[in-house]
Curated annotation (Swiss-Prot):
It is a multi-pass membrane protein. Keywords: Cell inner membrane, Cell membrane, Membrane, Transmembrane, Transmembrane helix. The chain crosses the membrane at residues 3-23, 49-69, 76-96, 119-139, 149-169. It comes from Methylobacillus flagellatus (strain ATCC 51484 / DSM 6875 / VKM B-1610 / KT). Plays a role in cell envelope biogenesis, maintenance of cell envelope integrity and membrane homeostasis. The lineage of its organism: Bacteria, Pseudomonadati, Pseudomonadota, Betaproteobacteria, Nitrosomonadales. Signal peptide: none annotated. It is found in: Cell inner membrane. GO terms for cellular component: plasma membrane. PANTHER family: INNER MEMBRANE-SPANNING PROTEIN YCIB (PTHR36917:SF1), INTRACELLULAR SEPTATION PROTEIN A-RELATED (PTHR36917). Belongs to the YciB family. This is Inner membrane-spanning protein YciB.
Length: 179
């Protein structure tokens, strides 16, 4: 259920785009993200840092799209978000000696430190490349195709990446974690 909750603004963007257009979809995504932040604050009393960052980026880039009536700003939004994730993953590990991927997953699985570092680096590289791929699609194909890619392409790539990581990491997960 959390997966659908997290994807709500993207799915709403896709639906509204198909029905009305890019500017209406951008406004809907901004509203949905603000609603998500408010809902998280009301129901749990806290808001996840990734959601706050996503909210700031959608308001800034979505707002610029609406204000200037230029869709290129909203097309940059996923790339900026992916690159912020890249900087966050690498910066936290290299500057603060804190592995964010490990922090998210270590309660579920146990692995040696070097494997956690490689996993963190793999995710950082994945987000970096996903940002470049988003720009490639945004500037070399139609807006219709970019919107489809934004939902289905990135979700598909994420799914394949997670499955690949799971298969590669399976040999490093302890027997206790597999039970």
């Amino acid at each position: 259920m959390k997966f659908l909750y997290d994807l709500f603004p993207v799915i709403l963007f896709f639906i509204v785009y198909k029905l009305f257009g890019i500017y209406e979809a951008t406004a809907a995504a901004i509203a949905a993200t603000i609603a998500q932040i408010a809902w998280a604050k009301i129901t749990t009393g806290k808001v996840d840092n990734a959601l706050i960052m996503s909210g700031v980026i959608i308001v800034v880039f979505g707002g610029a799209t609406l204000w200037l009536q230029d869709e290129s700003f909203i097309k940059w939004k996923p790339t900026i978000l992916y690159w912020v994730f890249t900087v966050g993953l690498l910066g936290s590990q290299w500057l603060f000696k804190r592995n964010l991927i490990r922090g998210l997953m270590e309660k579920q699985i146990t692995m040696p430190d070097p494997i956690w570092s490689r996993l963190n680096l793999a995710w950082a590289i994945f987000f970096l490349l996903l940002g470049f791929l988003n720009l490639y699609v945004a500037y070399n194909y139609s807006t219709d195709l970019w919107v489809d890619f934004k939902l289905f392409g990135t979700m598909g790539l994420m799914f394949v990446f997670v499955i690949g990581q799971t298969l590669l990491l399976n040999k490093h997960i302890t027997e206790q974690d597999k039970k």
